[in-house]
């Protein structure tokens, strides 16, 4: 099976300025918000940073023990503990409004508006095909399901693939995800925050 996965950044309007600068120094993670407010967090002994990023209203760190996210309206780093072996399998992505972390059995989003983590379980033994946060939406595609998270929503939206239905193409833009399967066209948009399906045959 050949999967075509293309991620297209088609931001509407002006691009959002990065409002958070992040750094790691002397076993601390540091966020400087809008050049004025500095918020730091002490890492544990031997805790190692695996990934970091900042974009728009968010900054994030993934360590071998925890997932840290901060927004421009935060007064402290938000911290999510991770289970053993989760960080090594983690796929992280960041947009101006949404932070996304996908591990072996769960997808974790963080919305800048609500300042909280949003979690959903992934099917065991599924293959991960795509995990991407774009401007207003974050999408996780596995071999049996598609999950979408929109800006300012409180839960992932989920749609199941049918028996013998296969994914042929995935396209993710700033406000919409389109998944073409062997039977259907599945779309997830920030305006509706749910998956819509259109039969191809």
Q: Predicted segment positions?
A:
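Structural motif
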Residues: 27-30, 65-71, 105-111, 144-150, ...
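N-terminal, post-signal-peptide region of Sec/Tat-exported proteins
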Residues: 31-67
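A short beta-strand motif characteristic of beta-propeller blades
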Residues: 36-43, 47, 76-82, 116-122, ...
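Bacterial N-terminal signal peptides
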Residues: 1-6
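Blade-level signature of beta-propeller repeat domains, shared across WD40, Kelch, NHL, RCC1
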Residues: 180-201
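An edge-strand/N-cap motif at the start of beta-rich repeat modules
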Residues: 8-40
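Repeated scaffold domains used in trafficking and secretory/extracellular systems
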Residues: 11-20, 44-57, 82-97, 123-136, ...
């Amino acid at each position: 099976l050949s999967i075509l996965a293309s991620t297209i950044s088609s931001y509407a309007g002006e691009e959002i300025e990065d409002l958070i600068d992040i750094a790691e120094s002397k076993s601390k993670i540091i966020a400087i918000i809008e050049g004025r407010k500095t918020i730091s967090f002490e890492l544990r002994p031997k805790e190692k940073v695996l990934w970091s990023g900042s974009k728009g209203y968010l900054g994030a760190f993934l360590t071998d023990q925890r997932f840290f996210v901060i927004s421009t309206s935060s007064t402290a780093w938000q911290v999510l503990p991770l289970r053993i072996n989760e960080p090594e399998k983690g796929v992280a992505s960041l947009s101006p409004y949404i932070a996304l972390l996908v591990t072996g059995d769960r997808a974790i989003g963080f919305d800048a508006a609500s300042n909280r983590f949003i979690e959903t379980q992934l099917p065991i033994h599924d293959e991960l095909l795509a995990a991407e946060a774009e401007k207003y939406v974050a999408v996780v595609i596995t071999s049996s399901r598609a999950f979408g998270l929109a800006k300012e929503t409180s839960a992932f939206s989920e749609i199941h693939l049918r028996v013998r239905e296969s994914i042929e193409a995935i396209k993710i833009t700033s406000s919409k995800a389109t998944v073409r399967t062997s039977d259907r066209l599945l779309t997830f948009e920030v305006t509706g925050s749910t998956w819509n399906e259109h039969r191809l045959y």
